[in-house]
């Protein structure tokens, strides 16, 4: 499928533009909080994960830090999600 296909959602680069089941590209935000890490063991991934929340000038969003990101990212850091995926959590 081509990225120019109108059925493919365009990547979000601001929190206000995030849509479920859509790619996220070049989204910058400041990390507001990081929750305690936990160990995940599955067929797809084994390692530490931590929930976090961040904000830009348009809103606040939850995200998951994976593997080395858990220890590399700190509250107050400005991060860029270069290639991510938006999911709706209920």
Provide a role label for each language-model segment:
Residues 1-27, 32-39:
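OB/S1-fold single-stranded nucleic-acid-binding modules
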Residues 35-44, 68-90:
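OB-fold single-stranded nucleic acid-binding module
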Residues 33-63:
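OB-fold (S1/OB) nucleic-acid-binding surfaces
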Residues 28-30, 64, 80:
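Ordered hydrophobic segments in well-structured contexts
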Residues 17-23, 46, 65-71, 75:
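Short amphipathic alpha-helical molecular recognition features
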Residues 2-7, 13-19, 48-51, 55, ...:
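Terminal helix-to-tail segments of small alpha-helical proteins
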Residues 11-14, 61-67:
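Short interface patches used for recognition in eukaryotic signaling and trafficking proteins
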